[in-house]
C-alpha cells in the first residue's frame, strides 16, 4: 500500500517533465515558455554583469598600469632635472625677466672672453686681448663653468669642458697663490663635477690639489701661501715678512674636505683640518685673529684684525665647514670658533653719524680704525646664514638684525657714488657718515652675495630691488662692446681694462640666483665656497660617488621662507 502510494507520487512528479503534459494544455505551455525566458534572462544578465565586471576590472588594471608608467616617467624626469631645466620654473614674471637679463649679461661676458681671450686667465676688453694673471691656468674658463651650467648655457659649458679635458695643464713653472688657486681652480672644478657628474673635472681637481699639498709641509702645519706648481717649492711673500696670511691659510678647508669625500683619499682633509686644530689650541677669547701668522710656530703676529682683505674668508669658512659637515658633532668646533669670532665682531661694530650706518671697523693694536672694505660686505650674508644655528633664538635674531643693518650700509656704498657703483673701501668720519677711500671698482660680488643670502633667508623682496639697482649700474657703467670692465674711479666713471674672472664666477651668478626660484641650488643642499662655487653637502665620512646624488630636484625651499614683503630696515 505504501509502495503503491510512493510510485503514484513519483509518477505525479515526472509528468511535469513530459512535453505531452504541456501540449495538451496551452496555458501550461505558455507558463513554461515564460518561465524559461525568465530564467534565461536572469542567467544571461548574470553572465553579462560578470563580463562587464571583468571588463571594468581589466580597464582599471590597465589604468593602474598606465598611471604607474606615468609615475615612473615623472620620477625619471624629476631625477634628471638639473639646474638647467629649472630655469623655466619662475615665481613671478618680474623675476623671470630679470633672470633673463642677467643671463644675457653672462652670455655677453662669456662670448667676449671666447672671442678675444679663449684659454687665457682673463679678458682685457678695451684692448680686446687676454692676459695670464694666474700663470695660464684658465682662470675665467674654470671660474665660469658652474655659472654656465646653472644658467643652462649647455653649448658654452660643453665647449669649456672640452678645453678642460684637452688643454688644461697644471705642469707649469709658476709660483701660484695657494688661496687663489684653491678657491678658483680647485673649487671651480669640484663644483662643475658636483653639478654635472663629469669625472674629468674631479681628475683635474686632484691633479692641481696634489701640486698644492707640499705647501702644508711646515713645522706647525700652517701652510706657506705660494707654491711652484711644477717643482713644489713653497714660500711666503716677502712683503708679508715671512708670515702666512690668515685668509690664505684658512680658506682651503671646504675644497680639500670635499675632495677627500669625493675621492676617498683622506690626505686632503687631514692637511686642512690640522690648520684649524692648531689655531684652535690658542684661539683668542674674542675669536679675532691678526692677519699674519708664523708658519713655524702658528703664533699670530701683532698685526691688523679685519673682516676685509686678508682676514675675511677665514671666518666665513669656520661657519661654512660646519654647514658642509651637516652640523654634526665632528664639526662642532668650527661652529664654536665661529660663534666666538662673531662675539668678537660685535666689538668692532660702530654706527656713523648722523644717519646711523652700521659698519665694521678694523683694529690695530687696541685702536679701532673707522674703515670698512667692500670685501667685508660678505659679512651680512655670513651672519644671515649662521643666525639660525644659535641655540638661543634671541642670539640668532640679534645677528640677523646686524646682518640686515650691515647690508643697508653696503648697499649705500653703491648708492653714495655718482656711478652707483661702490669703491674699494670707505671711511666713516664723525658727522659725515661714509666717504669713499680707494675709489676703484673691479666688479666685486660681496654685496650682491649678501643680498642673495638675505633674500633667500628672509623673503624680503627689498633685497632683490637693491640687487637689481646694482646690476643696472654695472650695465650702465661697466658694459662695453667687448665685455665688462671695472672702473678706475667710481666718481668719474673712467674705465679700466680688466674683466675679472670672479665677475663671471660670483657677481653674475649671485645676481642670477637672486631672482631664481629657491629650488635652484637650495641652501640646505649646497654650500658656496668663497668664489661662489657651490659644493654638494653629503655625509662627512661618506665616500660614495656623488654622480647619482648631484641632481638638483624640484622640491620645497631650502629654508622656511618668511612671507615675501617689501621695505628696508627702518632706522631709529
Curated annotation (Swiss-Prot):
One term of GO molecular function: mannosyl-oligosaccharide 1,2-alpha-mannosidase activity
Segments passing through the bilayer: 28-45
Cytoplasmic topological domain: 1-27
A cellular component annotation (GO) from this entry: Golgi apparatus
Annotated Pfam families: Glyco_hydro_47
Residues annotated as glycosylated: 326, 460
Cited Gene3D superfamilies: 1.50.10.10
Group of enzyme by EC: hydrolase
The UniProt record lists the keyword Amino-acid biosynthesis: no
pH dependence: Optimum pH is 7.0. Stable from pH 5.0 to 10.0.
Co-factor binding details: Ca(2+) or Mn(2+). Mg(2+) can be used to a lesser extent.
Catalytic residues, chain numbering: 180, 312, 424, 446
Coiled coil regions in record: 51-81
Named cofactor requirement(s): Ca(2+); Mn(2+); Mg(2+)
Function: Class I alpha-mannosidase essential for early N-glycan processing. Progressively trims alpha-1,2-linked mannose residues. Produces Man(5)GlcNAc(2) from Man(8)GlcNAc(2), but only Man(6)GlcNAc(2) from Man(9)GlcNAc(2). Has difficulty acting on the terminal mannose of the b-branch. Involved in root development and cell wall biosynthesis.
Protein name, UniProt field: Mannosyl-oligosaccharide 1,2-alpha-mannosidase MNS2
Taxonomic source organism: Arabidopsis thaliana (Mouse-ear cress)
Amino acid at each position: 500500500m505504501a509502495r503503491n502510494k510512493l510510485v503514484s507520487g513519483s509518477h505525479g512528479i515526472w509528468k511535469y517533465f513530459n512535453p505531452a503534459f504541456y501540449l495538451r494544455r496551452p496555458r501550461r505551455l505558455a507558463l513554461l515558455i515564460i518561465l524559461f525566458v525568465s530564467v534565461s534572462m536572469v542567467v544571461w544578465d548574470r553572465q553579462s554583469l560578470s563580463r562587464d565586471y571583468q571588463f571594468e576590472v581589466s580597464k582599471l588594471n590597465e589604468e593602474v598600469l598606465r598611471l604607474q608608467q606615468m609615475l615612473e616617467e615623472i620620477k625619471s624626469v624629476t631625477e634628471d632635472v638639473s639646474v638647467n631645466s629649472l630655469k623655466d620654473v619662475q615665481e613671478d614674471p618680474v623675476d623671470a625677466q630679470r633672470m633673463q637679463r642677467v643671463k644675457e649679461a653672462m652670455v655677453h661676458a662669456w662670448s667676449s672672453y671666447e672671442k678675444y681671450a679663449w684659454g687665457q686667465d682673463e679678458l682685457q676688453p678695451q684692448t680686446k686681448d687676454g692676459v695670464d694673471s694666474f700663470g695660464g691656468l684658465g682662470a675665467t674658463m674654470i671660474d665660469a663653468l658652474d655659472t654656465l651650467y646653472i644658467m643652462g648655457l649647455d653649448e658654452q659649458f660643453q665647449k669649456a669642458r672640452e678645453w678642460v679635458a684637452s688643454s688644461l695643464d697644471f705642469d707649469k713653472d709658476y709660483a701660484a697663490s695657494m688661496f687663489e688657486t684653491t678657491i678658483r681652480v680647485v673649487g671651480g672644478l669640484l663644483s662643475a663635477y658636483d653639478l654635472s657628474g663629469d669625472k674629468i673635472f674631479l681628475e683635474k681637481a686632484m691633479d692641481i690639489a696634489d701640486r698644492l699639498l707640499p705647501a702644508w709641509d711646515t713645522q706647525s702645519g700652517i701652510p706657506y701661501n705660494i707654491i711652484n706648481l711644477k717643482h713644489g717649492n713653497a714660500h711666503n711673500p716677502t712683503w708679508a715678512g715671512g708670515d702666512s696670511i690668515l685668509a690664505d691659510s684658512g680658506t682651503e678647508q671646504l675644497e680639500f674636505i670635499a675632495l677627500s669625500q669625493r675621492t676617498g683619499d683622506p690626505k686632503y682633509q687631514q692637511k686642512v683640518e690640522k690648520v684649524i686644530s692648531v689655531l684652535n689650541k690658542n684661539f683668542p677669547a674674542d675669536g679675532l685673529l691678526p692677519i699674519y701668522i708664523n708658519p713655524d710656530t702658528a703664533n699670530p703676529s701683532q698685526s691688523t684684525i679685519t673682516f676685509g682683505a686678508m682676514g675675511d674668508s677665514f671666518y666665513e669658512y669656520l661657519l661654512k665647514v660646519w654647514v658642509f659637515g651637516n652640523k654634526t658633532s665632528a664639526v662642532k668646533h668650527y661652529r664654536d670658533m665661529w660663534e666666538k669670532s662673531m662675539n668678537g665682531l660685535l666689538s668692532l661694530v660702530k654706527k656713523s653719524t648722523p644717519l646711523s650706518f652700521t659698519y665694521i671697523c678694523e683694529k690695530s693694536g687696541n685702536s679701532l680704525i673707522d674703515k670698512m672694505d667692500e670685501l667685508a660686505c660678505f659679512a651680512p650674508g655670513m651672519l644671515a646664514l649662521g643666525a639660525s644655528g644659535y641655540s638661543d633664538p634671541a642670539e640668532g635674531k640679534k645677528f640677523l638684525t646686524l646682518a640686515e643693518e650691515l647690508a643697508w650700509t653696503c648697499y649705500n656704498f653703491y648708492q653714495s657714488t655718482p656711478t652707483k657703483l661702490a669703491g674699494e673701501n670707505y671711511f666713516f668720519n664723525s658727522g659725515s657718515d661714509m666717504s669713499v677711500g680707494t675709489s676703484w671698482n673691479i666688479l666685486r660680488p660681496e654685496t650682491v652675495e649678501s643680498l642673495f643670502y638675505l633674500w633667500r633667508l628672509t623673503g624680503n623682496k627689498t633685497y632683490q630691488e637693491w640687487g637689481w639697482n646694482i646690476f643696472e649700474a654695472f650695465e650702465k657703467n661697466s658694459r662695453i662692446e667687448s665685455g665688462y670692465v671695472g672702473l678706475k674711479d667710481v666718481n668719474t666713471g673712467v674705465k679700466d681694462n680688466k674683466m675679472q674672472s670672479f665677475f663671471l664666477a660670483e657677481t653674475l651668478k649671485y645676481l642670477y640666483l637672486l631672482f631664481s626660484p629657491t629650488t635652484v641650488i637650495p641652501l640646505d643642499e649646497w654650500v658656496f665656497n668663497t668664489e661662489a662655487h657651490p659644493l654638494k653637502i653629503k655625509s662627512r665620512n661618506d665616500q660614495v660617488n656623488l654622480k647619482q646624488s648631484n641632481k638638483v630636484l624640484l622640491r620645497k625651499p631650502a629654508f622656511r621662507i618668511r612671507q615675501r614683503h617689501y621695505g628696508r630696515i627702518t632706522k631709529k
